[in-house]
C-alpha cells in the first residue's frame, strides 16, 4: 500500500525483485505525485509486479493489509511480506527469498535500521541502533490479521527473527511535511482511536514553521522523543542508495563480519 512515494517506490520494488521475490502486489492509495504512473510503467517491465488502486483515503491500514494478505493466500503464496515503499528488506545471510525458503518458522521478524539524509554530507546515513519496533513476514494462514503499521501478524505458529530492514522514512523536507499532513488526515478520516498512531498526531499538529525546525534537527542527527522515526544511535554513511545485500549494510555500520577478528561469532 503506497501513497505519494514517487521518489522511492521504484527503488524499493526493484530491490524486492533483486531479493528474489517473484510476485509483488502494490496498491496505490490515491497518489497525486505520479506514483501510480511509475508503477504502471514498471509493471510493463516486471512480469511479477501486480498493481492495484485503493480510493479509500481513511487510515484502515490493518484491514486493508489483511485483505491483501488473504488475496495472496488464496492464490497460493508461500510467504507474505507486507512492505512499505520506504522499506528495503534483507535476509541476514543471503537474499530475502533465500532466508524465507530455508526458514522453519511461521512468522519471521525483521529488525529495523532507519536511514536518514544529513545536511553535512551527501547520501543516506544509517543508524547503527536498531529501532525498537519490528516488522514481520509470515506464512499464509486463513484468519491471519496484519496489525497496524505491519509491525506484527496475528496467527499461530513459531517465530524467528532472521530478517533485516533498512527504512528510509524521510527523504526531503517537502516529503517530510507532506507525509505528516497526509498521515494525520487519514487518521482523522478513519476516526482512529486517540491512543493509536500517537506520533502522527504529535507531528501533524505542529505548524509548518515547527515542522521546518524539526527537519533541521533531523538532518543534523537528532529529533524530539515524540518523533518515532528519528536518529537514536551513531549514524554511518551508507551511500547514495540502499545497498543490495545486508553484508554491505553491516560493513557501512562498521560491524565486523562473522568469524573475522573482532567479531563475536564462531
Q: Whereabouts are the PLM-identified features?
A:
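Catalytic-site signature of metal-activated, phosphate-bearing donor transferases
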Residues: 63-64, 91-266
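Short acidic/polar active-site loop segments enriched in Thr and Asp
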Residues: 22, 78, 106
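Short beta-strand/loop segment that forms part of the nucleotide-sugar
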Residues: 22-30, 52-54
Amino acid at each position: 500500500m503506497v501513497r505519494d512515494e514517487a521518489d522511492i517506490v521504484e527503488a524499493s520494488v526493484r530491490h524486492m525483485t533483486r531479493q528474489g521475490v517473484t510476485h509483488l502486489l502494490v496498491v496505490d492509495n490515491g497518489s497525486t505525485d505520479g506514483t501510480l504512473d511509475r508503477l504502471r510503467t514498471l509493471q510493463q517491465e516486471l512480469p511479477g509486479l501486480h498493481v492495484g488502486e485503493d480510493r479509500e483515503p481513511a487510515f484502515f491500514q490493518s484491514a486493508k493489509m489483511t485483505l491483501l494478505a488473504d488475496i495472496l493466500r488464496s492464490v497460493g503464496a508461500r510467504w507474505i511480506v507486507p512492505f512499505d515503499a520506504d522499506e528495503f528488506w534483507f535476509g541476514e545471510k543471503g537474499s530475502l527469498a533465500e532466508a524465507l525458503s530455508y526458514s522453519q518458522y511461521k512468522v519471521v521478524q525483521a529488525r529495523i535500521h532507519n536511514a536518514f539524509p544529513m545536511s553535512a554530507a551527501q547520501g543516506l546515513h544509517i543508524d547503527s541502533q536498531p529501532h525498537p519496533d519490528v516488522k514481520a513476514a509470515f506464512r499464509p494462514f486463513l484468519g491471519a490479521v496484519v496489525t497496524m503499521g505491519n509491525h506484527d501478524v496475528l496467527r499461530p505458529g513459531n517465530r524467528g527473527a532472521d530478517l533485516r530492514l533498512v527504512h528510509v522514512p524521510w527523504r526531503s523536507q517537502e516529503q517530510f511535511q507532506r507525509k505528516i499532513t497526509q498521515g494525520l488526515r487519514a487518521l482523522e478520516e478513519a476516526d482512529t482511536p486517540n491512543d493509536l498512531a500517537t506520533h502522527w498526531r504529535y507531528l501533524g499538529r505542529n505548524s509548518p514553521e515547527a515542522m521546518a525546525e524539526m527537519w533541521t534537527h533531523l538532518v543534523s542527527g537528532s529529533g524530539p522523543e515524540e518523533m518515532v522515526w528519528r536518529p537514536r544511535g551513531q549514524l554511518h554513511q551508507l551511500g547514495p542508495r540502499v545497498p543490495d545485500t545486508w553484508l554491505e549494510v553491516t560493513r557501512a555500520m562498521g560491524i565486523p563480519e562473522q568469524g573475522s577478528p573482532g567479531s563475536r561469532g564462531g
